[in-house]
Amino acid sequence: GVSMGATTVLMAAGLQLPPNVHGIMADCGFTSANAIWEHIAKDNLHIRFGIRSAIADRMCRRKIQVGSKEHSTVEALKHTHVPVILVHGADDHFVPVEMTYENYTACTAPKDLLIVPGADHGMSYFMEPEKYENAVKAFWAKYDRPRCEA
């Protein structure tokens, strides 16, 4: 997945996944809804997030019955056994590359990391297609095999 898709698959990583899931690929995923909203408010919109955090959380609870702070990729990755490859553009101004480093540190499963210099949000493949493809091929060569259930 890319961006929100990356975050979705990383959050799913903490679930009991079926044995046919041999790996997870995440490109420029963020750590939580609250974390990305805070970053966007502060760095992109240049407004304080403070009280808006509580408002956003309340809106989430009312609309989807889940709080904006309830789930995070960091927590999910502490419980995964599925190999993960994390990719991020070093010059991403929408989702900070530090979030991928947080995810990488939290991940307890076998993991690979590719940071692409000069790439903005979701542009890693387009900046370095050969490097990206080689990293993905190497990842699947290592981990694309049946795994034991933990």
Locations of the language-model features?
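Active-site nucleophile elbow and catalytic-triad environment of alpha/beta-hydrolase enzymes
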Residues: 60-76, 82
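Short beta-strand/loop motif that positions the catalytic acidic residue
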Residues: 79-81, 86-88, 92
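Gly/Ala-rich beta-loop-alpha elbow adjacent to hydrolase catalytic centers
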Residues: 1-9
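Acidic catalytic loop of the alpha/beta-hydrolase fold
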Residues: 91-95, 122-123
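Hydrolase active-site cap/lid region
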Residues: 11-66, 115
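Short alpha-helix in the alpha/beta-hydrolase fold that links the catalytic acid
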Residues: 73, 82, 96-105
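Catalytic histidine neighborhood in serine/cysteine hydrolases
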Residues: 104-123
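Catalytic active-site module of serine/aspartate enzymes centered on a nucleophile-bearing elbow/loop
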Residues: 127-150
